[in-house]
């Protein structure tokens, strides 16, 4: 199934047209999916708002890197391999497997503290919270430190990480905490990351539309 934004724009009825099968010249890109028992292949074409006249190959490589980092963060818990069994999700970007990025550095030997999981039953379902303090910069090599900072860096990635059924919805920030003055992302708090799990039954309370 596919959409064509040019076809939608040209349709006088204003309808949202949905097409079956590959667009002309695109079938070869979809061929790898035929060898899989199940899965989803996402193909973006005609990215005229992204690939502009000034766009270079370096810009495109940077974009791919940013997409990979975002996928590794948003789906990291589904991509992680459990002690027994297979990961719930496997992602490939240009035939390259996306490796999960763990914002809490679970298992790092220099991690000073993390709390046990605190669970509370709410009218919308079970909510679980874990607090994590990450290692000091001295515990990392320079590449490790940069990777642990996340896509947006150490200061921007501090705060709450809100998950719905294992998928990350919010990556950092303090969700309006603070009496009279909201907390901001500051250098002094950059080692603090809090994991908050909510169920899909809490969508209305959290105003989630997925």
Regions found by a protein language model. Name each.
Residues 10-12, 26, 51, 105, ...:
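A broad, structure-centric signal for solvent-exposed, well-ordered loop/edge residues
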